[in-house]
Amino acid sequence: MSKQNPIREPQQARSQKTMNQILDTAAAILEQKTFDQLTVSEVVHQAGTSVGAFYGRFRNKEALLQALDERFFQRFEQDFEELQLELDWDNQTITTIIHDTAKFLVEVYRRDTGVLRSLNLKARLSDDSQFKAREKNAWDTMYPQLQRRLLQHAACITHQDPGLAVRFGFRQMFFSIREFLLWGSLRENFRYDLETLSNESARAFISYLGVEEQ
């Protein structure tokens, strides 16, 4: 295990299966606990593996969070690519694309709430450069594609600066969804069901652009 990489990549299918079990178990535990509260012994016990198997793949507990981080962003980029193809965005209206994007973000943050809460806390409190680099890479992968598709419908946008409106409106929608899903449990008076959160976030973006709902 090199100094540069605290995660030992599995070389065999069995080793990959064990690693996936550890990551899946850790992600499930993080839905109920913070990363500081999570313990290696708890993870391996629930994963049905051993402490030795854990340290054979991860240098320490921090490496586990890094692996969860890397897996999330790999899935995020893959899922976004599939979304565009499956929903045929080349032939959809601007409002449909925005609603699809809001649903996608809500599903991503619902599916990985515990992991993303832990990653965001670590990035904020410890200035984790690796997380920030992967977050920027995911953003640079997603946003330009979305921007291009939305600006193909610039004639529908009545905001005086369509480019600015798309950039600002998307960030507004993205960060609103993230904050509600990661920290909403701390604000009992501001909780919404997932469908409402998705629909209202999309409607706010569409309204800001000055686009008529289609």
List the predicted regions and their residue ranges.
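C-terminal peripheral helix-coil segments that are non-catalytic and often amphipathic
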Residues: 1-6, 144-152, 163-214
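Amphipathic alpha-helical linker/stalk segments
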Residues: 70-97
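Short amphipathic alpha-helical elements of helix-turn-helix/winged-helix folds
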Residues: 25-29, 108
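Amphipathic alpha-helical packing segments from all-alpha helical-bundle domains
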Residues: 77-82, 96, 107-114, 118-121, ...
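Amphipathic alpha-helical interaction segments
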Residues: 21, 42, 63, 96, ...
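Generic hydrophobic, amphipathic alpha-helix propensity
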Residues: 15-26, 43, 68-80
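Helix-turn-helix
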Residues: 21, 29-63, 67
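Short, flexible helix-adjacent loops and helix caps
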Residues: 31-35, 81-89, 121-124, 151-158, ...
